[in-house]
């Protein structure tokens, strides 16, 4: 179910302030955030936002194809450990 158009996209207020300040000063410093549920807006295009994945901040460079998606989609929280070879020695 999508979000109501009446409400508009969700962006954490502290993140919106940091993005506005970065755009106004035209700086390309990395913006750290823990807000994975914030929606990427067109004003964020060209910025690098470090999104927390539970262990570390993963830098995400925002491009125009990412607009409308959530920040957490580009910062995976789980690492895939490949399936071990079915060897009896490996099980010991």
Swiss-Prot record:
PROSITE patterns: RIBOSOMAL_S19
Location of the protein in the cell: Plastid, Chloroplast
InterPro entries referenced in this protein's UniProt entry, alphabetically: Ribosomal_uS19, Ribosomal_uS19_bac-type, Ribosomal_uS19_CS, Ribosomal_uS19_SF
Major localization class: plastid
Keyword Glycoprotein: no
One function term, GO molecular function aspect: structural constituent of ribosome
Alphabetically ordered keywords of this record: Chloroplast, Plastid, Ribonucleoprotein, Ribosomal protein, RNA-binding, rRNA-binding
Keyword RNA-binding: yes
Pfam families, sorted: Ribosomal_S19
SUPFAM superfamilies from the UniProt entry: Ribosomal protein S19
Signal peptide: none
Single biological process term from Gene Ontology: ribosomal small subunit assembly
Function description: Protein S19 forms a complex with S13 that binds strongly to the 16S ribosomal RNA.
Similarity comment text for this entry: Belongs to the universal ribosomal protein uS19 family.
UniProt name for this protein: Small ribosomal subunit protein uS19c
């Amino acid at each position: 179910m999508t979000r109501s158009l009446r409400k508009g996209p969700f962006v954490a207020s502290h993140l919106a302030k940091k993005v506005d300040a970065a755009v106004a000063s035209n700086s390309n410093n990395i913006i750290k955030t823990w807000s994975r549920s914030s929606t990427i807006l067109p004003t964020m295009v060209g910025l690098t936002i470090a999104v927390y994945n539970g262990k570390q901040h993963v830098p995400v460079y925002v491009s125009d194809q990412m607009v409308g998606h959530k920040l957490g989609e580009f910062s995976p929280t789980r690492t895939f450990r490949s399936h071990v070879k079915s060897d009896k020695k490996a099980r010991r």
